[in-house]
Amino acid sequence: SAFFFTVAAYHSWALPRPGSDTRNSSGRSAADIFKEFFDTFRSFFRKKQIWVAIAFMLLYRLPEAQLVKLINPFLLDPVDIGGLGLSTSQVGFVYGTVGIIGLTLGGIIGGIMAARGGLKKWLWPMAWSMSLTCLTFVYLSYADAPSLLTVNVCVFIEQFGYGFGFTAYMLYLIYFSEGSHKTAHYAICTGFMALGMMLPGMAAGWLQETIGYR
């Protein structure tokens, strides 16, 4: 807690204060607050190509949304039912250490590439990166007793691709939220982002029980 307090105090001092970041000291009635609340949603859904944007928010992470719910069960389940039969400690290292390293590196490199070439140039490569790297788990599901090293490499590739591809997703949300009420609009976008993970994830377990890991 002391560390977080120190970091928060530093950021309070170091971060810039743009002119738009000012406290509204004028007295407002409850009716005005509710009116602004609904105006925020109204202006969001009146944005240009809003339904295309919502479809993008919901579908961009579709493969990952289904995969992420089943990674741990797949790694832990016995071999005779299609899993890899890893121990809990092995899964902790594979997904909690190697996977996090891949995710972090992918995000850093994705940010560098997007800063140099822009979102328009990197959107499709990042989208393919997020989806195609999920095929590493297709390989693991068909591989005959893959070694722990192979599992680590596959998880690293998949998580690296996810981190790299997620950069484009976050930049798109930021760009789409620009304009009036941009902070509130970004919050609404993150709600659709969460929905895009939750809905496919709800069906992932049913699909696995129906067709198995293969």
Ranges and model annotations:
Residues L105-W124, Q208-E209:
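Helix-to-loop junctions at the C-terminal end of transmembrane segments
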Residues W128-P146:
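C-terminal ends and interior cores of transmembrane alpha-helices
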Residues T88-S89, G179-C189:
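Loop-to-transmembrane helix entry/capping segments in MFS-fold secondary transporters
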Residues G19-V52:
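Juxtamembrane intracellular "pre-TM" segments in multi-pass secondary transporters
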Residues A2-T22:
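C-terminal membrane-cytosol helix-exit motif in multi-pass small-molecule transporters
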Residues F164-E178:
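Intracellular juxtamembrane helix-capping segments at the cytosolic ends
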Residues Y60, K69-V91:
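Short amphipathic helix-loop junctions that connect adjacent transmembrane helices
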